[in-house]
Design a protein with these regions (language model features):
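Residues that define the transmembrane beta-barrel architecture of outer-membrane proteins
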Residues: 47-55, 80, 90, 100-106, ...
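Short loop/turn motifs that connect adjacent beta-strands in outer-membrane beta-barrel proteins
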Residues: 6-18, 64-82, 147-159
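Outer-membrane beta-barrel "beta-signal"
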Residues: 57-61, 134-159
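Transmembrane beta-strands of outer-membrane beta-barrel pores
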Residues: 24-30, 63-65, 88-94, 114-116, ...
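Residues on the lipid-exposed face of transmembrane beta-strands in outer-membrane beta-barrel proteins
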Residues: 1-3, 26, 55-61, 108-112, ...
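Outer-membrane beta-barrel translocator domains and adjoining extracellular loop/strand segments
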Residues: 31-44, 70-73, 94-104, 131-138, ...
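A mid-sequence, solvent-exposed acidic-amphipathic segment
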Residues: 23-83
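Transmembrane beta-strands of outer-membrane beta-barrel proteins
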Residues: 13-24, 55, 69, 82-86, ...
Length: 159
């Protein structure tokens, strides 16, 4: 689900390129336990697979929308095709020993959108020690197959 702010009044026109999206959903494991064999110790280890709730949201600012529908502020390529994005993907444990604990990251980044592809780059910052201790990097390469092949893959199935 999401909401763009293109309907804001003229006095708030520079906020119109903002959008927020969100997601929430339960995760149920197909097996309640994992059984692993430790070759070093010769012991069998049993770990629980908890039920979790995945939730999160993104905050986005589209420089494409700003340039096209609010005001052309003179951004040149490649900046006029960028979207500033911060993702907040989270997971809450609902069962087992981790019940109530939250893990997640904050992922500030940018996405460049072209006619046939988009590229993105973001930092991945853990929100707590359960999530991790180091900052990571996320990359995105997305090809718009329907635009690359509009007469075959991109064509309607039924006419």
């Amino acid at each position: 689900m999401g909401k763009g702010f293109g309907d804001l009044p003229e006095s708030l026109k520079y906020l119109r390129p903002f959008a927020i999206t969100g997601v929430v959903g339960p995760n149920f494991p197909t097996q309640s336990n994992n059984v692993t064999f430790n070759a070093d110790t010769g012991e069998t280890e049993i770990g629980q697979n908890p039920k979790t709730l995945t939730w999160g949201f993104t905050l986005q600012y589209s420089l494409i929308y700003l340039q096209s529908f609010v005001k052309d502020i003179g951004l040149g390529a490649p900046f006029n095709r960028m979207i500033l994005v911060t993702e907040f993907p989270m997971e809450t444990c609902l069962s087992a020993d981790c019940k109530g604990q939250i893990t997640g990251t904050v992922n500030p980044g940018i996405v460049w959108v072209g006619k046939y592809t988009e590229f993105g780059l973001a930092a991945q910052i853990p929100i707590n020690s359960r999530t991790g201790k180091s900052v990571g990097v996320l990359g995105l390469i997305h090809f718009f197959i329907d635009d690359l092949f509009p007469k075959s893959i991109g064509a309607p199935i039924f006419h």
